[in-house]
Amino acid sequence: MQSEAELRSLLSRIDHRGYPDYKDTKGQYRFPGYVLSIDHVQGDPFASPSKVSVLVSGKTAGFPQELYCGKCQRIALQDELLRQFGRRAERFAFKAKGSGKSGLISVSRCGQEVLERTACQIQPENGNILLRMEIGFPANGRTINARELEKILFDFVPECVKASLFYKNLDAKRLRRIVDLAEDQEYIRKELPKRGLCVFVANGSVLPRESGISSRPMRDGIAFQSPTEQEVTLELPHKGKITGMGIRKGITLIVGGGYHGKSTLLKALELGVYNHIAGDGREYVITDATAVKLRAEDGRSIQKTDISMFINDLPNGKDTTSFCTEDASGSTSQAANVIEGIEAGTSLFLIDEDTSATNFMIRDELMQRVIHREMEPITPFIERIRELYENYGISTVIVAGSSGAYFHIADSIIQMDRYVPKDITVLAKKEAENFPQISVPEQLAKKPAYDRVPRPDQAFHGNDRIKMKTMGKESVMINRDTIDLRYLEQITDSEQVAALGYCVRYAQKHLIDGKKNLIQIVDELEEVMQNKSLAELCESTSSVSCMAVPRRQEIFACLDRYRALRLG
């Protein structure tokens, strides 16, 4: 390891040389209070910025252990330190001049959700803090401008580090509040199954968002108020008593007129699988962590999935116990999404009729009379929903605005009336008595088989070069194959997409052997991320600055949508 003086001398030596000579700076340098590591140097001022990291020892950082002793506390603290560093870095961005990306200083941009990221990691055993950033090494044309880089590395970065990664320079009360909030959120999440709940929405929550392109809370948004019949009070470790709506396990229907807030509530439930920052409005909207948003997904590929619970006797004779297609219809895609959700270990399905295949969700009495059951290959979801709960322990929350078919079988019915929820279970059930109930098959569906094994001929070996590119939250490309993730609505950050790409790549290089099935492969991927780190999925330190931990459910979904992965 070299000293900061040696780095300064090196920069002076390479000043005004050709840009490739910046490669000589790669290495570690000891600065007062931390170690600076130049992990990867860009080859051109217009290329992706250089990867730089700082390591602050736990003793120097000085954070009390109780702020990072548990996983939820550690993730919350990492998130806050990253935000603090990012705000400081923005003040210095492009103050060092030059061509291309010269002077850029950036870290991961955190949204409203609190995610575990590779950009800031605290080692729980000793409190060491590793923070990764990107820096555009300055140039004049394609000539090194070392004096400007010296400003960044010797003035700007040290100020950011000291202001955001040293406990003595931060607001201790604010940090305590952030960690306390994370502990309260984790407490609610653990309390849900004990109380027979799958969702909790606190009174006073603000669910509407600022706009379609902003996840910040709507200014003057109507505060949530639970129906009296569904109110639950919890005693949190730090906040104390909190009251809100508890959605019980089973079948819950959310109804109401258009624009009255049904989908807004469901959207909040979708993202309630994550913790949210203070001031978001959804801090105490907590959903079962395994919840999966279901929808139709026309055109997706399906490989060796047993959809016979819902679809049988296709006119083309296709086997639905091991169904394959490169262009799924709305109903077959939604059926596959249900089965894959069960395989991924979900305990809660979230469904909006607006994005569902109608023929998959319901089949009314008139249609059943005209098109007899033996002529219809689809068993609609309404006929299996109770079975899913009683035999698989999977609850369902459905948003409906056009069909009352689910009134008969719902355990709870909530009406959104001008953004205010009302419990109308008794009223709706009484009205439903005047309408025929959809018949349910007497025979239970055969339990789907989950023994899909990726073929090893699709694995990468040795030094095979693998190119990977992410396109926001939409997709990830591995070599020439694009994995379409547009309809995985619980992906909340592009860095989760990057992590999913690395999960696929790691599985292909290290886990796919023709023996392990998908469940075993995902188990091992989770083990790597939990027991080692997310960064372990990468092949070099130059690749680990932009990932956020994905859920198990999204890892499964990504593998299921990877057309190049052949399952046996």
Where would I find each of the regions flagged by the language model?
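Carboxylate/His-rich catalytic cores and anion/metal-binding grooves
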Residues: 193-199, 203, 259, 266-297, ...
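Glycine-rich phosphate-binding P-loop
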Residues: 242-274
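N-terminal pre-Walker A segment at the start of P-loop NTPase domains
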Residues: 208-243, 278, 286-291, 295-302, ...
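Flexible beta-alpha connector loops of hexameric P-loop NTPases
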Residues: 300, 310-331, 363-378
